[in-house]
UniProtKB/Swiss-Prot annotation:
Sequence similarity: In the N-terminal section; belongs to the transposase 2 family.
Species annotation: Acidianus two-tailed virus (ATV)
Pfam families to which the protein is assigned, alphabetical: Cas12f1-like_TNB
Domain of life of the organism encoding this protein: Viruses
Molecular function in Gene Ontology: DNA binding; metal ion binding
Official protein name in the record: TnpB-like protein ORF383a
Coiled-coil segments: none
Amino acid sequence: MARREKNPIRATVSMKIGLSDSLLAFVNNYVRALRFSIFWMKENVKNPNEKGTLSKVHEGLYGKLKEDYNLPPKVSADCYRDALAIYKSWYNNPKRGRFPRVYKPTVWLTPKRSYTVDLDRMVVKITSVGELPILGYPRNLKEYANWDMKEARLTIRDGKAFLKVVFEKPKVKIQPKGSVAVDINMSEIVVGKDDSHYVRIPTRLHESHHFKTLAENLQKKYPRRWKENKRILHRIRSFHHKAKLIMEDFARKVGKWVVEIAWDLGANVIKLENLKNLIRNVNKLSAEFRDKLYLMQYHRIQYWIEWQARKHGMNVEYVNPSYSSVSCPKCGRKMVEIAHRYFHCPSCGYENDRDVIAIMNLNGRGSLTLSTAPQMRDVIPNR
């Protein structure tokens, strides 16, 4: 039996597929079977964590789901495994709220046995339904042509059918040949390896903060009416949603740009700041700076950088950011600010912008240089 790959790289791709009467009937039968399976487990499975639970569930449900709900053999197995996952999630929850009920029309499908995707013909074949055309898909779908297909979710929403497929590939071990560092600030993100090879990426924080301010101004203008008036409430929600989408879009694009810059500079290791407990002392900050700190989503940006790096075969390393913006990268002495965000070293005379100083110091830390510096716990964010 093949050994499961440890920490593989996964991506979920959503595709819009054609809707048919047979597909709607298939989904309806699955949802009814899923409801029955969950309540059957409530009565017959007292502890889902016990050994042999899956065999017991198979004996009690497999035949019934095939006969009473007209599900194909493999889909019947998918159905009771889906129900067991829902029941186990509820059972292991310490608070254990209301017993789970199924309302959304979703189907759990297993690759090759329950469904197959042909990217050349752009069709999806689902057991007992047949072939359905792929009507919509992301532009980078072809990038996953050589990845392995895993479990998928078939969902029906607003009269449209979507298939969300998980693609997976093993993580490749690489030999480090060079590194770049990333310094994330509110005004710009700096990516580079030294003071002559770096790129500045302006952020969109001011746009996001603008829409958040518009929403708050409406709440101040209508302190009582905004909760009851649907038009005002919709407007406020749309402003907050725009602010969130702007930063999410920026974070996704930054991940791609950082990887491209690293390739151009001949590096395959990306060093990021260890920002653990970044907002521990957030209450001591001003209200405006606190809002911008939340909107900036430092960890979200780092998440997409790491995801794109792993996808393209690069390593990501988190290093200690302590004093990286104020320590001289040449001699290590503390530097003095002589202008706005511009520092001078009184010892060796080196001068530069604090962001460039930061990437030089960050790039000199980590495993490539066998650093033994302890990880930082409290980080003061850059303005």
